Amino acid sequence: CLTLKPMVQKLQKNYSVGRVIVVADKGLNTGKNIVYQKAIGNGYVMSLSIRGANQELKDFVLNEDGYEYNQDKTYKKKSRLYPREVEYVKTVNGKPVKAKTTVDEKQVIFWSADYAKRAKAERQLAIDKARDLIGNVKKYNKKNCYGASKYVKHLVFDKNTGEIIEAKSQLSLDEDKIAEEEKLDGYYAIVTSEMKKTDSEIIDIYRG
């Protein structure tokens, strides 16, 4: 997995800086990176995938309790202090061993009407492609239907060629999946070690 360790080590060594707050997107939000930064006294502000999160976090995000709105209701935010279990690899007797630990974090959730519109528009392109796939199966394979295939029920690919295998059941649009995704349009989650900072400060740090 991607690691921030070499980058941060070089920064702190070359510029003789003290404690730093590492800002990263969800691709670098790994247990390994978080455990390392905390171990050397650094902080972090990282985005977290809501769609890939557990149901508890999704429920918290969709629960209206605690949200603060702007005047025209196009933006809202809330937060909580919450312990999160992360997985990482540690070395025991010279061998890598999988381990888990709990980190205390502040989770900041925000929603933007503009982000929601953008997500809906981007998904609609994939849905249109999925509909075309259903009606014109021979035009597509695993490679050229990327992004759309997840919205098609009963779709099966040949593991070797990537070609679409004739399904036992008729292909159809996965309306339930689309509806579930729509619920989370426009929402973003940020996790941070900086629990004393305000929600707005955390969001500003993440946005740079």
Give residue ranges: language-model regions.
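Anion-binding and metal-coordination hotspots
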Residues: 1-208
